[in-house]
């Protein structure tokens, strides 16, 4: 199941079902995070995926009077483009890297975005980069880019 499939199931469900599905969705993203984390061969305490209010933050965007408006998942169903694909982002906010004492060293935003039914891993370090998830090599490339971002951040501190 892709993130996109999972998200489509979340809309218009009861809060109880929604919460359970959020957890499944978060697990899906944490899978990406763990692949990225395993690529790090630097001495860090832990890497964790932080989420908005303990759950992934799902939102749709739509255009209104020439400007883009962002709405959260509990306000209305996804907005569809003319070609039928939804304007949806799925964010797993930030990966926190801590030292052995649990002190935060750095945090690098890492999210998954759905665009034209393609899943993308988005990493914002010194540079912004998107990786279309079409096979495992894309995840490995994202992991390598993330690792480089981490090393650059650590060099600054």
What label would you give each PLM region?
Residues 47-110:
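Amphipathic, interaction-prone secondary-structure segments
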Residues 1, 5-12, 16, 68-72, ...:
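Alpha-helical context
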Residues 28, 99, 154-157:
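Low-complexity, intrinsically disordered/propeptide-like segments
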Residues 1-57:
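Charge-rich, low-complexity N-terminal segments
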Residues 107-157:
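Glycine-rich, aromatic-bearing surface loops/beta-hairpins
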Residues 14-18, 22, 29, 81, ...:
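Intrinsic-disorder-associated interaction segments
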